[in-house]
Amino acid sequence: MKKRDFMKISVEGAVAMSSLNAKENNAGERVEKSKVPLANPSKEAAANAAKNPFGLVYDDAISKNEAGKVNLTPVSYKSRGLDIAANVYTPANFDPNKSYAAIVVAHPNGGVKEQVAGLYAQRLAELGYVAIAFDAAYQGASGGMPRNVDTPANRIEDIRAAADFLLKFKGVDRDRIGVLGICGGGGYTLKAAQTDKIFKVVATLSAFDSGLARRNGFLDAQISTIQQRLKDASDARAKEVLTGEVEYVPDPDLTDEEIAKITNDLYREGLKYYHRTHAHPNSTFAYTKSSLLELMNFDAASNMDLINQPLLMMVGSKADSAYMSERAFAGASGTQKKEYFKIDGALHIDTYYKPEYVDVAMKKLAQFYGENL
């Protein structure tokens, strides 16, 4: 398969750390034999992470914990028997004997907690919230085999498990837990909040419907190949069962010149972000091909009427992914308080790191959470 052929399938993919030839820890028999890199071995990724003691790759990231400032505490907790790696950001002068509202921040497809999810978690802590950014199960620094499984059920449970952790975190007001989902994490956040009312407020930034994109292709570019791709995913699952070999949709390895020629803003700017400017060693777009069996049956926009909490959905006004948020927001008939907010001039990826757009998003979040949480 040529790079440009799999680009359409894999660019919005999942994240994971390298774990080649590792035994599968559930069935106990499966062994990964993939030749696909399951992490980012690039010099850019290593250099970015090395700049910060916590491995954070966003601007103005915490580099040490100091009194009177936002602090970061790496934590680990169990979810369905797996170890989940997370960072908890606490406000300046945090006092565990007091009561604080808290926010779960769900990372994008292709992201880890040290990237945009960490940025927004830190900024929320600066506003006085306890915030948690975590790596999805089977991805990043979290546990799970095979690596890079990327299924909706897992991603939704990850969000719930982060809230479970906050329920037991001393200083968190259990009646004031909200959620912020970014990109793919936004789509899964909508699903989690439809049924789990632990989340008192729901916000998304540049939400991405992973099911819609995997099924139809981004901007409906792959509708004609749905059945063939389902057949390929079915064959990949059968291969796992019969041989133990795990097939992956690979992470595209493109030159700067090839990236510049990509016409979709999301994919072009996303590759720049994840492969260059904000690359992280644990971040990759590779995911197990068999995951498509669940992904292609997922729809973030279905049952949106079940959300009765205050809802804020933010998109860049120039984002080519905005149709996904529009589609989901249109179905949100169950809440009396909802807002679809456009960040003027921003593309999808711009909202991840460009100060002029991050500041607008944070100002809106401050208002939204302040009024409703």
Language model feature labels by segment:
Residues 5-25:
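N-terminal export signals
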Residues 51-98:
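N-terminal cap/lid segment of alpha/beta-hydrolase-fold proteins
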Residues 110-122:
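The serine-hydrolase catalytic nucleophile loop
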Residues 123-141:
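Conserved alpha/beta-hydrolase
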Residues 149-170:
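Alpha/beta-hydrolase active-site loop
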Residues 190-272:
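Alpha/beta-hydrolase-fold enzymes
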Residues 307, 313-315:
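Short beta-strand/loop motif that positions the catalytic acidic residue
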Residues 346-358:
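Catalytic histidine-centered segment of alpha/beta-hydrolase-like enzymes
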